[in-house]
């Protein structure tokens, strides 16, 4: 079981959707690193099909990284991470998920 903590900022679809908050943000290193993590997740899931390897977006979580401006508590952000870490062998692999379901790549 591998749960990679990604972000909507790593999704080209999310960051180019004018209806999403993420489309208003400008960055280079953080979004690029999360996009790379998403590709690593996808490739590892294909290379190791017996493992559950997924990327999750905890949402805009109030942490030191954003000066505690996030709209979710750490407990709320951690929920999807913990849920995915508890998957059994029949759970998804190679997916990008948030608390509401699939996130577009």
Please provide the spans of the model-predicted regions.
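Short, flexible catalytic-loop segment of classical short-chain dehydrogenase/reductase
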Residues: 11, 58-64
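Conserved short-loop catalytic and cofactor-binding motifs
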Residues: 25-28, 65, 69
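Generic preference for well-ordered secondary structure
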Residues: 21-24, 61, 80
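A generic structural signal for ordered alpha-helices
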Residues: 15-18, 55, 59
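C-terminal helical subdomain
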Residues: 35-38, 51, 55-58, 67-105
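Catalytic loop of short-chain dehydrogenase/reductase
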Residues: 1-49
């Amino acid at each position: 079981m591998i749960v990679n903590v990604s972000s909507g900022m790593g999704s080209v679809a999310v960051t180019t959707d004018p209806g999403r908050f993420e489309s208003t943000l400008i960055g280079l290193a953080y979004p690029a690193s999360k996009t790379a993590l998403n590709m690593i997740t996808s490739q590892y899931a294909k290379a190791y099909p017996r493992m559950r390897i997924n990327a999750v977006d905890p949402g805009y979580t109030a942490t030191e990284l954003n000066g505690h401006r996030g709209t979710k508590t750490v407990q709320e952000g951690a929920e999807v991470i913990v849920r995915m870490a508890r998957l059994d062998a029949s759970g998804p692999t190679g997916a990008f998920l948030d608390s509401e379901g699939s996130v577009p790549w």
